[in-house]
Amino acid sequence: MYNLSSIIRRKSTRIYVGKVPIGENAPISVQSMTNTKTTDVAATVAQIKALQSVGADIVRVSVPTMEAAEAFNQIKQQASVPLVADIHFDYRIALKVAEYGVDCLRINPGNIGSELRIRDVVASARHHGIPIRIGINGGSLEKDIQEKYKEPTPEALLESAMRQVSFLERLNFDQFKISVKASDVFLAIHSYRLLATRIDQPLHLGITEAGGARSGSIKSAIGLGILLSEGIGDTLRISLAADPTEEIKAGFDILKSLRIRSRGINFIACPTCSRQEFDVIGTVNALEKRLEDIVTPMDVSIIGCVVNGPGEALVSTLGVTGARNKSGFFEEGERKGRLDNQQIIDQLEAKIRAKAALLDKKNRIQINQL
């Protein structure tokens, strides 16, 4: 497929969350966060595995209490994906999970306490060889910054971020990434743009509290899409009030749309009209659900008639062009036969799986190639 993309990634330093590289032109990693009670070890482990099954590179787990920290110890032993511990208010929890082998600590300067406490967290991170994510959020800025700016502004988020960066620099600690999240799309965009010009550490992208699955995905796609198209961002999370697996799917969809990183099938489908010769919407919905396990990147066009079908099939890995009773099937732009419209879902699924097996290029981050 013709690609007009000319994204030049912002230069950044590299850190590792577990074995996943972040920054310095590493593939943009996609992460999510569990929403189970962390003290429910079985439920949390099950959700981590579900997230991993749809492509999560990193999973964040909230650790609000010492009891949750003890549960985290058990969870970490059962997880094969890198885990980030989300810490607020009590810095001692960060020290405890560091002992338990956490892969990254996420702290919020607005509520973690004094610089002395942050100093202790940094010392622990250094000792255990783990990075820190500094999470700046428009809804929880430090009190003096709130009083100065009266409301969240890009300058307020930047000041909060640079305060922490300067402190970490004084401690000679450079193993960190940083985020400046806001629920307002423009506030987030401008905050990240400002920060990107001031530091070279990796940036964690996100629109915080974006909303439900539909509206939140759209807000995140607009905000993160603009930043990513400008080369800003090294890892991302799509924050949705929905099943966390939807965050991973949305994250990959955004990266896929910008041709930055692909995972699984990119379906190209018409919105349908009276010319469609088979149920396009039902076919696409069924195949998206059936083929969630496919990680091989490929473009599959499903067009209900001959107006645009042949043209889309020409530039797709596989394509279907609607025709009466039997629709045309294309592979790599060449017509390869016809599919029975009554059996089109089963037949197309088989074709896609066969092609995926042939290509066999799993698009996960390959550590040994970086």
UniProtKB/Swiss-Prot annotation:
One of its GO terms (biological process) is terpenoid biosynthetic process. PANTHER family: 4-HYDROXY-3-METHYLBUT-2-EN-1-YL DIPHOSPHATE SYNTHASE (PTHR30454), 4-HYDROXY-3-METHYLBUT-2-EN-1-YL DIPHOSPHATE SYNTHASE (FERREDOXIN), CHLOROPLASTIC (PTHR30454:SF0). The keyword Ribonucleoprotein does not apply. This is 4-hydroxy-3-methylbut-2-en-1-yl diphosphate synthase (flavodoxin). It is an enzyme of class 1 (oxidoreductase). Its EC number is 1.17.7.3. The lineage of its organism: Bacteria, Pseudomonadati, Pseudomonadota, Gammaproteobacteria, Enterobacterales. Converts 2C-methyl-D-erythritol 2,4-cyclodiphosphate (ME-2,4cPP) into 1-hydroxy-2-methyl-2-(E)-butenyl 4-diphosphate. InterPro entries: Dihydropteroate_synth-like_sf, Enolase-like_C_sf, IspG_bac, IspG_bac-typ, NO2/SO3_Rdtase_4Fe4S_sf. Pathway: Isoprenoid biosynthesis; isopentenyl diphosphate biosynthesis via DXP pathway; isopentenyl diphosphate from 1-deoxy-D-xylulose 5-phosphate: step 5/6. Binds 1 [4Fe-4S] cluster. GO terms for molecular function: 4 iron, 4 sulfur cluster binding; 4-hydroxy-3-methylbut-2-en-1-yl diphosphate synthase activity (ferredoxin); 4-hydroxy-3-methylbut-2-enyl-diphosphate synthase activity (flavodoxin); iron ion binding. It catalyses: (2E)-4-hydroxy-3-methylbut-2-enyl diphosphate + oxidized [flavodoxin] + H2O + 2 H(+) = 2-C-methyl-D-erythritol 2,4-cyclic diphosphate + reduced [flavodoxin]. [4Fe-4S] cluster binds at residues 270, 273, 305, 312. Belongs to the IspG family.
